[in-house]
């Protein structure tokens, strides 16, 4: 589909018109701004000069006249004034303080420009429109993986090339989740038949299949070094050590319905899980045991709808953001050390996904009905910085580029869009001040 034909170019910014009181169409003087005494003097001075031509003014009198005119500001006074003079600025500080302020101006960080439209759009036909699945991920090698029905495609952001990784058999599919390993080479693929396949993207070779742990589809995946955590419709969360023959090392039981969100913290010590039972669990890796069912560290029950959107803060330890579904519509912030809810913000619509900026104190959320938008928030004030529109269906999936600048979003409208929303970090600007932006100005098909 040629989505690019519907894109609107950047609108030219027009300056606002001046106040209508100043847009005068006739040259009618403003009487309140006129000095009638000086006007009479100026108009009659030349005639008086002719009548008194015999009288020769001395140099001292001429100098006195000029000095008097300068003092009274007569040389700069118009006879016909069409508007009032602007009011003189009020001196709020003593002159010595004012001078010091002019000598040391305060530096103000310019506001970052945030494009309101997507920079690139790829066609994503047959993407499964299911809130509980996770079908998009961007690996550390700058390759984006997306599952379209039974097929997994890889899009190389560095070259713009597209390749097919695997097409799953009908009896096993469709693909229900996908997640890159930290090395950016190996990718896990969750299936509708409860299996998880591990693939080498460099050689397009299947390495192994994990099965027997779940009884139904695997809708969420999360890597923690060599541990692959899987979440199923059966409510189970399983830690798999992919290095060993019998991979299951821990099983977490706490959700009563499908596990639709999984995220490990940056330290790898805590796991957040969200489910269709409206519950968020925090699990501690240090107390996990393979001998018995592991108890959660915190059980968070404040949401009133399914919790799929989970995001650990990159700049503040133990800070977790969670988003609720259509019956909840809130973003909540948690201290996972104490289990306390720090803040709750009503977004007005279903929260499908959350991403923290790696470079700024900002949070991006994707939403469903009615606007199907991406909203950028300033943290911790939670003031809206921008709303990005373009999708015509709920924005179910988001993924962030390795450099943290670009976000990819996929929706039920069968489009994959790229947004330059988070900006370039200051370190990258200093290292490459003349970097050329990627040519995100046309539309390609992903297959």
UniProtKB/Swiss-Prot annotation:
Cross-referenced InterPro entries: Cdc20/Fizzy (IPR033010), WD40/YVTN_repeat-like_dom_sf (IPR015943), WD40_CDC20-Fz (IPR056150), WD40_repeat_CS (IPR019775), WD40_repeat_dom_sf (IPR036322), WD40_rpt (IPR001680)
Subunit annotation: The APC/C is composed of at least 11 subunits that stay tightly associated throughout the cell cycle. Interacts with APC10, FZR1, FZR2, FZR3. Part of the mitotic checkpoint complex (MCC); interacts with MAD2, BUB3.1, BUBR1 and BUB1. Binds to cyclins CYCA1-2, CYCB2-1 and CYCB2-2.
PROSITE patterns hit by this protein: WD_REPEATS_1, WD_REPEATS_2, WD_REPEATS_REGION
UniProt keyword annotations, A-Z: Cell cycle, Cell division, Mitosis, Nucleus, Repeat, Ubl conjugation pathway, WD repeat
Gene3D superfamilies per record: YVTN repeat-like/Quinoprotein amine dehydrogenase
Annotated localization: Nucleus
MF GO annotations: anaphase-promoting complex binding; kinase binding; ubiquitin-protein transferase activator activity
Species this protein is from: Arabidopsis thaliana
Tissue: Expressed in meristems and organ primordia. Present in flowers, leaves, stems and roots.
Superkingdom classification of source: Eukaryota
A Gene Ontology BP annotation from the UniProt entry: cell division
Function in brief: Component of the anaphase promoting complex/cyclosome (APC/C), a cell cycle-regulated E3 ubiquitin-protein ligase complex that controls progression through mitosis and the G1 phase of the cell cycle.
UniProt-recorded name of the protein: Cell division cycle 20.2, cofactor of APC complex
A Pfam family recorded for this sequence: WD40_CDC20-Fz
Induction of the gene: Expression starts to rise in the S-phase and peaks in the M-phase with a non-negligible basic expression level also in the other cell cycle phases.
């Amino acid at each position: 589909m040629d989505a690019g034909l519907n894109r609107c170019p950047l609108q030219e910014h027009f300056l606002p018109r001046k106040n209508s009181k100043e847009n005068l169409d006739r040259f009618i003087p403003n009487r309140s701004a006129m000095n009638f005494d000086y006007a009479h003097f100026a108009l009659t001075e030349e005639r008086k000069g002719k009548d008194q031509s015999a009288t020769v003014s001395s140099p001292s009198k001429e100098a006195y006249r000029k000095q008097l005119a300068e003092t009274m500001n007569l040389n700069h006074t118009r006879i016909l004034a069409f508007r009032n003079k602007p009011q003189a600025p009020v001196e709020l500080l003593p002159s010595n303080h004012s001078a010091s302020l002019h000598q040391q101006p305060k530096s103000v960080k310019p506001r970052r420009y945030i494009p309101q439209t997507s920079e690139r759009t790829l066609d994503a036909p047959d993407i499964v429109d299911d809130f509980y699945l996770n079908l998009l991920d961007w690996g550390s090698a700058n390759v984006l993986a997306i599952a379209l029905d039974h097929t997994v495609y890889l899009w190389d952001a560095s070259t713009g090339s597209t390749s097919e990784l695997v097409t799953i058999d009908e009896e096993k599919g469709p693909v229900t989740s996908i997640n890159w390993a930290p090395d950016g080479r190996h990718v896990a693929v969750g299936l509708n038949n409860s299996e998880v396949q591990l693939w080498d993207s460099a050689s397009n070779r299947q390495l192994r299949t994990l099965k027997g742990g779940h009884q139904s589809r695997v809708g969420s995946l999360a890597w923690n070094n060599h541990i692959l955590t899987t979440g199923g419709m059966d409510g189970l969360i399983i830690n798999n050590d992919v290095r060993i023959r019998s991979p299951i090392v821990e099983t977490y039981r706490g959700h009563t319905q499908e596990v639709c969100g999984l995220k490990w913290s940056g330290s790898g010590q805590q796991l957040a899980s969200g489910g269709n039972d409206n519950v968020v669990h925090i699990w501690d890796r240090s107390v996990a045991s393979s001998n018995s069912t592991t108890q959660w560290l915190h059980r968070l029950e404040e949401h009133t709808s399914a919790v799929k959107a989970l995001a650990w803060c990159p700049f503040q330890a133990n800070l977790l953001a969670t988003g609720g579904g259509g019956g909840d519509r809130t973003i909540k912030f948690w201290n996972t050390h104490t289990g306390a809810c720090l803040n709750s913000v009503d977004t007005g619509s279903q929260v499908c996904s959350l991403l923290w900026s790696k470079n700024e104190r900002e949070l991006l959320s994707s939403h469903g009905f009615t606007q199907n938008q991406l909203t950028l928030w300033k943290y911790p004030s939670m003031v809206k910085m921008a709303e990005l529109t373009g999708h015509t269906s709920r924005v179910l999936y988001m993924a962030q580029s390795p450099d943290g600048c670009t976000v990819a979003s996929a929706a039920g409208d069968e489009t994959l869009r790229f947004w330059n929303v988070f900006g370039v970090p200051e370190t990258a600007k200093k290292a490459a001040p003349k970097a050329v932006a990627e040519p995100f100005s046309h539309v390609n098909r992903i297959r």
